[in-house]
Design a protein with these regions (language model features):
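A conserved acidic beta->alpha catalytic loop
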Residues: 40-50, 67-68
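Short, acidic, metal-binding catalytic loop of nucleotide-sugar glycosyltransferases
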Residues: 24-33
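Donor-binding/catalytic cores of nucleotide-activated saccharide
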Residues: 71, 92-202, 206-224
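Short aromatic/hydrophobic "clamp" motif used to bind/position activated sugar donors
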Residues: 87
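N-proximal low-complexity "stem/linker" segments adjacent to membrane-targeting elements
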Residues: 1-25
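Membrane-interface aromatic/basic loop that binds lipid-linked glycans or pyrophosphate carriers
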Residues: 267-333
Length: 333
């Protein structure tokens, strides 16, 4: 079955600075049977008016308005309104890249998910075909050694992009809008539990502007470890369903969460209080593998002087020192 009739869902919250770019990128060379659903998530600025303006300018664009509920809730509103055979999620501060529609024209597949590559402003190109040949894969086990990097190293399988979902298979599946983080990871895991196959498309067709100030990757938050705990049972169930031992993947998931949470604490500004920082550092250092990985990373840190307190705090398991240093550094630098 060829790829036609795609619904693109764009959740919008205070997105007036980037939304035109996102919509223009989706419309470039797009087929007439494609639809774009702009979901204004109760934005307090002029985002809602811009959604209406863009919808008035092209019949393929529809503006939807809802009370603020977060990205997951906004995506759910889009899913409820979608009519396409396929669904593609695009963030309002990101963009689709030229060539996607022509590449999809050449795809004939019965798979329920089509996965392609993205480029991040911070790190460059990542695509599934860096790890395995293009084509259809019957289940996760068929991905072999590519599964772990696609899940954890690149996040290509875990994020709601860069991919298409067959809407018929989605059925009533929705994002858990009670979660503040990882609701997209849980959504993908749940979809993979009910889907048949994955098609890996060669090419980079999604651009993620992850260095902009509103990006989650640049905001200090303290819930990454809790979020990983919430999604771990669903991940284990998915892996068992595909005949895989979940233990090594659970270990990697936990290690990644520890390293990412450490990175946010050490590298991002925010108003997280000392007690919460200390508790998070203590939990990270209690994981021996995470502590060893951090020691190795800090040995190679190019910021020699600034890294000294981190090296001491990690080596001597002093979470209080690490918490205090991050606060002091934030105030002085």
């Amino acid at each position: 079955m060829s790829i036609r009739n795609v619904s693109i869902i764009i959740p919008c919250y205070k997105a007036s600075a980037t939304l035109r770019r996102a919509v223009a990128s989706a419309l470039t060379d797009a087929p007439s049977d494609m639809e774009i659903l702009l979901v204004d998530d109760g934005s307090p600025d002029d985002t809602g008016a811009l959604c209406d303006e863009l919808a008035a300018a092209d019949p393929r664009v529809t503006a939807l308005h809802r009370e603020n509920g977060g990205a997951g809730a906004a995506r759910n509103t889009g899913l409820d309104a979608a009519s396409g055979e396929w669904v593609l999620f695009l963030d309002a501060d990101d963009a689709l890249l030229p060539g996607l529609w022509s590449a999809l024209d050449g795809v004939i597949t019965d798979a329920d998910m089509i996965l392609f590559g993205l480029t991040r402003v911070s790190t460059g190109d990542i695509q599934p075909t860096d790890y395995l040949p293009a084509g259809e894969y019957a289940d996760l086990a068929a991905l072999g050694g590519a599964l772990s990097p696609l899940l954890f190293d690149t996040g290509l399988l875990a994020a709601p992009y860069p991919k298409l979902f067959r809407r018929r298979t989605l059925g009533g599946l929705r994002f858990d809008d009670r979660l503040q983080i990882n609701e997209d990871v849980l959504f993908n895991i749940q979809f993979l539990q009910i889907s048949s196959a994955i098609y890996c498309l060669h090419g980079v067709y999604y651009k993620q502007y992850d260095t902009e100030s509103g990006s989650l990757s640049r905001r200090l938050r303290g819930d990454l470890l809790d979020a990983e705990r919430i999604t771990r049972p669903a991940l284990a169930a998915l892996l068992r369903k595909n005949g895989l031992d979940p233990a090594p993947y659970e270990h990697t998931s936990r290690l990644r969460a520890c390293l990412n949470q450490y990175g946010l604490l050490a590298g991002c500004r925010g108003d997280l209080p000392y007690a919460r920082r200390r508790a998070l550092f203590a939990e990270i250092l209690a994981d021996n593998d995470a502590r060893a990985a951090l020691q190795e990373r800090l040995r190679n840190d190019p910021n020699k002087l600034l890294a000294v307190p981190y090296r001491i705090g990690v080596a001597w398991n002093w979470p209080g020192m690490l918490a205090a240093y991050t606060l002091i550094k934030q105030r002085l630098l």
